[in-house]
Amino acid sequence: MKESSRLRGLYAITDSKLLADGRLLPYVEAALKGGARLLQYRDKTSDEARRLREADALQELCARHGAQLIINDDAELAARLGVGLHLGQEDGSLAAARALLGRQAIIGATCHAQLPLAEQAARDGASYVAFGRFFQSHTKPGAPAANHELLREARARIGLPIVAIGGITLDTAPSLIAEGVQMIAVIHALFAADSAAEVERRAQAFSQLFNTP
């Protein structure tokens, strides 16, 4: 599968608080049924055994639905499962992760609102770069704001797929996609829902934005 086709569409990111009390697997499966093409497992706790169990179960769900699993900030877990990795600016060396995971692995990099960080990530072997926050974010409310001009500059200077993240909703996503963003990363606007059925409905709505002419 070409990288361009693997790295496009709704990028769902888990949240250990939103998806507590048994919601993780049913809500994630609902997002995948709704069309999410990538799933990032983001869990900052120290319970390695539980994270391995959950990541293994998520890998099975992603395989069943033809989606890509990305592990947040745990290169060893990503290597163990043979899946992708996402690194923040303080999560270790991207070049070292590339050496560990191999040439074919998907490795993404958080670049905040800074084009130089994205250019460095591209040199270090990133598969995609993530910019944000674009709007007020529940997950990282104090993060510096990114804007549409940054996206235009990044498209002109970096030959990698771009992820937009940070407070994105169904109302605000279209303007980002219109700027050429290949992936929209969503947490609360997807998973802060009362039921798995609602998650699936939201995922379908986000996914349809990428099919609009």
UniProtKB/Swiss-Prot annotation:
Cofactors demanded by this protein? Mg(2+)
Q: From what superkingdom does this record's organism come?
A: Bacteria
Can you tell me which residues bind 2-[(2R,5Z)-2-carboxy-4-methylthiazol-5(2H)-ylidene]ethyl phosphate?
S137, H138, T139, G167
Instruction: Give the record's pathway.
Output: Cofactor biosynthesis; thiamine diphosphate biosynthesis; thiamine phosphate from 4-amino-2-methyl-5-diphosphomethylpyrimidine and 4-methyl-5-(2-phosphoethyl)-thiazole: step 1/1
Q: What is its EC number?
A: 2.5.1.3
Q: Which GO terms describe its molecular function?
A: magnesium ion binding; thiamine-phosphate diphosphorylase activity
Pfam families, A to Z: TMP-TENI
Q: What class of enzyme is it?
A: transferase
| Catalysed reactions listed for this entry | 2-[(2R,5Z)-2-carboxy-4-methylthiazol-5(2H)-ylidene]ethyl phosphate + 4-amino-2-methyl-5-(diphosphooxymethyl)pyrimidine + 2 H(+) = thiamine phosphate + CO2 + diphosphate; 2-(2-carboxy-4-methylthiazol-5-yl)ethyl phosphate + 4-amino-2-methyl-5-(diphosphooxymethyl)pyrimidine + 2 H(+) = thiamine phosphate + CO2 + diphosphate; 4-methyl-5-(2-phosphooxyethyl)-thiazole + 4-amino-2-methyl-5-(diphosphooxymethyl)pyrimidine + H(+) = thiamine phosphate + diphosphate
Which InterPro entries does the entry link to?
Aldolase_TIM, ThiamineP_synth_sf, ThiamineP_synth_TenI, TMP_synthase
Q: From its record, what is one biological process in GO terms?
A: thiamine biosynthetic process
> What does this protein's record comment on cofactor binding?
Binds 1 Mg(2+) ion per subunit.
Residues engaged in binding 4-amino-2-methyl-5-(diphosphooxymethyl)pyrimidine:
Q40, Y41, R42, D43, K44, N72, T110, K140
Q: Which GO terms describe its cellular component?
A: cytoplasm
Q: Which residues bind Mg(2+)?
A: D73, D91
Give the keywords, sorted.
Magnesium, Metal-binding, Thiamine biosynthesis, Transferase
Protein family membership: Belongs to the thiamine-phosphate synthase family.
Its annotated function is as follows: Condenses 4-methyl-5-(beta-hydroxyethyl)thiazole monophosphate (THZ-P) and 2-methyl-4-amino-5-hydroxymethyl pyrimidine pyrophosphate (HMP-PP) to form thiamine monophosphate (TMP).
Query: Under which name does UniProt file this protein?
Result: Thiamine-phosphate synthase
